[in-house]
Amino acid sequence: MAKTSTSPVAPTRLWVKAAFTGFRRSKHTQNSNQALLKLQNVNTKEDVAFYQGKRVVYIYKGQKKNGSNYRTIWGRIGKAHGNNGVAVARFAHNLPPQAIGSVLRVMLYPNRA
């Protein structure tokens, strides 16, 4: 019996990494309900248009009495911020300041086709 060789295939992800760079702000005012996200492999504001309306999730570990569990904060990408592939996202609950610099997941659904 011949043995067939299968090449290892990387698992398919239904999300893209995004770095939480900070809150949208002006000189004196910080809008803590608007988060700035730098999307992976997105370098122009035209590329950000594909991600408008996509869901974003911040996953963190919350402490409880017996161990810990994962918790999430969901949001949605609204528009581009500047010309370099940064997007503005709004969340159901504001992201904590400790999340600045952490990686969020941008889900590739819903599809706006």
Swiss-Prot record:
One of its GO terms (biological process) is translation. The keyword RNA-binding applies. Disulfide bonds: none annotated. The keyword Zinc does not apply. InterPro entries: Ribosomal_eL33, Ribosomal_eL33_sf, Transl_B-barrel_sf. Keywords: Ribonucleoprotein, Ribosomal protein, RNA-binding, tRNA-binding. Transmembrane segments: none annotated. It holds the Pfam family Ribosomal_L35Ae. Gene3D superfamilies: translation elongation factor selb, chain A, domain 4. PANTHER family: 60S RIBOSOMAL PROTEIN L35A. This is Large ribosomal subunit protein eL33. It comes from Tetrahymena thermophila (strain SB210). The lineage of its organism: Eukaryota, Sar, Alveolata, Ciliophora, Intramacronucleata. The gene is RPL35A.
